[in-house]
Curated annotation (Swiss-Prot):
InterPro entries the UniProt entry points to: ATP_synth_OSCP/delta_N_sf, ATPase_OSCP/dsu
UniProt keyword annotations, A-Z: ATP synthesis, Cell membrane, CF(1), Hydrogen ion transport, Ion transport, Membrane, Transport
Protein name, UniProt field: ATP synthase subunit delta
Similarity section: Belongs to the ATPase delta chain family.
SUPFAM superfamilies: N-terminal domain of the delta subunit of the F1F0-ATP synthase
Length: 188
């Protein structure tokens, strides 16, 4: 729970910086934050390197500076670059992706968006994704964005997550529920 509080703390710090920026710099900041997020998500080894105890903090700072050197071109990106340095200095870089996800959720809330993750063992057809998007838009009264994430462990069906809510329509979820009911002597 303490790590979750730290994640929220750092995400709130990013959000506070974003709120202080003018419109142009908000766009640059958001775009750069997404670029960093996807770069690190797609190259997770980088997170492990920065989180490693083998490399000194000074070396990690040099690595971050070299990789994200272009970020220093605008004031909003200087904030992001310094934010990465703070995470490194505080030995919390391992949670960078979770921090960015929390930050993006705060932006979505600010802009009346709901971001949902649709987990399935296969790519869901666009028509079905649009139906899901429409249903959640009606249910929540918000504009909806979604991401279809492939999770082969689900076997079939899908699991939809947003915020702390989970709608599990997967075969794996049904099997897990039956298993739980049997273990707890509940009717199936």
């Amino acid at each position: 729970m303490e790590e979750k509080n730290h994640i929220d703390h750092y995400a709130n710090a990013l959000y506070s910086i974003w709120l202080e920026l003018d419109k142009k710099n908000k766009i640059i900041f958001t775009s750069s934050a997404k670029d960093i997020y996807f770069s690190l998500k797609n190259n997770y080894e980088m997170v492990h390197i920065i989180d490693s105890n083998i490399i000194s903090k000074e070396e990690k700072t040099k690595i971050l500076n070299k990789i994200f050197f272009d970020l220093s071109k605008s004031i909003s990106n200087i904030y992001l670059k310094n934010f990465l340095f703070v995470l490194n200095d505080n030995n919390f870089f391992k949670r960078i992706l979770e921090i960015f996800i929390s930050f993006f959720q705060k932006l979505d809330e600010h802009q009346n968006f709901l971001f949902i993750r649709i987990y399935s063992p296969f790519v869901v057809e666009k028509k079905l994704l649009e139906k899901i998007e429409h249903l959640f838009s009606i249910k929540t009264g918000k504009r909806v964005r979604y991401e279809n994430i492939i999770d082969k462990s689900l076997i079939g069906g899908m699991k939809i997550m947003f915020g702390n809510d989970v709608y599990d329509y997967s075969i794996k979820g049904k099997i897990d529920q039956i298993k739980w009911n049997i273990e707890n002597n509940k009717e199936v």
